[in-house]
Amino acid sequence: MTEQRKEVVQRGLWFEEYEVGTAYLHRPGRTMTEADNVLFTTLTMNTQALHLDAAWAAEQPGFGGERLMNSMHTLSTLVGLSVAQLTQGTIVANLGFSEVSFPKPVLHGDTLYAETVCTDKRESKSRPGEGIVTLEHIGRNQHGDIVARAVRKTLVRKRPAGEETA
């Protein structure tokens, strides 16, 4: 007799699994490096000296002479840290961002920790089998300071018929 093994595929949450008010903590964090900053900044053609020119940045007031991490890299990493837990294989579309802010700088060597709060969800009026989920992504550094925040609307699949509940 052959024993059937249970297989579990890593995925994000189906629409029905999101709970408004729940905070999802995404671990591990990600330490931001100089290599990350230079690569992302040059790939995106952002020539801002605050990201690339160490000598120039050293003469600028306000950041202790250090170069800043590119804020778009910070935002991308913040969202990326949430993917495995929330949207891997279940998202249909990223509908947009609002209320994006970077209240404190991120510097080389800082570690970004992400958390996401589901702030709203509703069934799609035009796309049966899908729903709109509003997520607030919050990034904190290794000291617990909020360094990034963004509200994002996503279109998420509902649980397929016949799919087992966890």
Ranges and model annotations:
Residues M1-V20, F102-T111, E115-A166:
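HotDog/MaoC-like acyl-thioester-processing domains
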Residues T2-L95, K158-A166:
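Hot-dog-fold acyl-thioester-processing enzymes
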